[in-house]
Amino acid sequence: MRSKKKQNRQDYSAGSKKVSLLTWILPWLVLLPGFPAIHFYFKSGILFNTPGAEEAYLRAKNLFSLFYHTAIYGGAVFAVLEVIIAFCYFLTYLKLCFGKDFASAKPYGKASLKCTFFAFGTLLLMFFVHAFTYGMGV
């Protein structure tokens, strides 16, 4: 009986690590297209004043536009995903608070409650950040 409880605890902790990793990585993926956008922004600025570099300037300007719009619309998509995931965490939080099995799940029930609330708050905060940056970009 004791080993079964220990196994359940290990299974739970492995699952929570995967979910926790997803909640930390997902909001930051939107930054990936931003780095090349910054590079091509400065490159097009330098080439703008360079005589005879019209073709290179247009190429850099088009690449900047591509990565900029990818970052902006990617931010909008991630904002929607974050709201969905945060809502799922909120439902899990409510289930843990008001569920019958919360009192019996003493070894990891309260830790799960704190982790779920923290993930919900983090995702909600990142949603507001991405919604603000998307609104400023449009």
Where are these regions (language model features)?
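Membrane-associated alpha-helix detector
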Residues: R2-Y73
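Intrinsic low-complexity/disordered segments
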Residues: Q7, T70, A79, S104-A105
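Short alpha-helical packing/oligomerization segments
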Residues: L58-C97
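Cytoplasmic juxtamembrane regions at transmembrane-helix boundaries
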Residues: Y89-F118
